[in-house]
């Protein structure tokens, strides 16, 4: 029995990958899950204020993991998982690789976003030399303090929610969701997901992004 459903946002709750337009049918499916007693949590590379707003206005109750795993909110409690990244380091990364900073960087402390989202070997080396982690979600590059990545944040959320791995479902679209999948019992990759994610998923869905969310929730509720 699934008690908690972890859902990624960009590329998963949206109409497709590469758009920020949320799929209304997917939101309705999340509400159906909540009504049936499955709590829904957002697990995303987005910042805390963006996810907290969505969590409350969409009528979710499972809490959230923001900043690509670095920030957790559950039942009124907030928790920082990763080391803080100094502002000068964020600017230096953008300057070195000629990247644009996300408008959400103003609201972040441990994980920062940049575009274009193309991850290069030199960036990984640059981050490693400074004790940092860099990943790409397909929407943005993420530079984070250690441990970085969705896994550590999801472990903390499950602990706060007092939910076991076997009682947890997860759905996502990108490589950055692999770590989230390792912490969940049933995992579903949308049809347009990165091949690396499909390889580790327990279910490869027939439908893309938001339509895939409806498909997965129908499965969980039937
Ligand atoms: O913030 C991003 O780059 C993408 O966010 P996601 O984890 O919801 O796909
Ligand atoms: Mg995504």
UniProtKB/Swiss-Prot annotation:
Lineage: Archaea, Thermoproteota, Thermoprotei, Sulfolobales, Sulfolobaceae
E.C. number: 3.1.3.18
Family: Belongs to the archaeal SPP-like hydrolase family.
Cofactor: Mg(2+)
UniProt KW DNA-binding keyword: no
Annotated GO CC locations: cytosol
Keywords, comma-separated and alphabetical: Carbohydrate metabolism, Hydrolase, Magnesium, Metal-binding
Catalytic activity: 2-phosphoglycolate + H2O = glycolate + phosphate
UniProt xrefs under InterPro entries: HAD-like_sf (IPR036412), HAD-SF_hydro_IIB (IPR006379), HAD_sf (IPR023214), PGPase (IPR006382)
The name this protein goes by in its record: Phosphoglycolate phosphatase
Active site: 8
A molecular function GO annotation: magnesium ion binding
Residues bound to Mg(2+): 8, 10, 173, 177
PANTHER family: HAD SUPERFAMILY HYDROLASE-LIKE, TYPE 3, PHOSPHOSERINE PHOSPHATASE
Residues annotated as binding substrate: 150
Function statement: Catalyzes the dephosphorylation of 2-phosphoglycolate.
């Amino acid at each position: 029995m699934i008690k908690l459903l972890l859902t990624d946002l960009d590329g998963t709750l949206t109409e497709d990958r590469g758009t920020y337009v949320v799929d209304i049918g997917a939101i309705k499916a999340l509400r159906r899950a909540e009504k049936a007693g499955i709590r829904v949590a957002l697990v995303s590379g987005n910042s805390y204020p963006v996810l907290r707003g969505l969590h409350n206005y969409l009528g979710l109750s499972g809490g959230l993991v923001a900043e690509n795993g670095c920030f957790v909110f559950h039942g009124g409690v907030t928790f920082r998982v990763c080391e803080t990244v100094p502002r000068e380091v964020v600017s230096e990364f953008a300057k070195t690789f000629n990247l644009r900073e996300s408008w959400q960087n103003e609201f972040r402390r441990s994980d920062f976003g940049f575009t274009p989202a193309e991850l290069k070997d030199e960036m990984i080396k640059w981050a490693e030399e400074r004790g940092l982690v860099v990943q790409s979600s397909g929407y943005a590059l993420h530079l984070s303090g250690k441990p970085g990545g969705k896994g550590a944040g999801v472990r903390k959320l499950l602990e706060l929610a007092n939910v076991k791995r076997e009682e947890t479902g997860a759905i996502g679209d990108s490589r950055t969701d692999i770590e989230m999948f390792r912490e969940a019992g049933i995992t579903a990759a949308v049809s347009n997901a990165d091949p690396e994610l499909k390889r580790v998923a327990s279910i490869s869905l027939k439908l893309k992004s938001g339509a895939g969310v409806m498909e997965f929730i129908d499965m969980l509720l039937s």
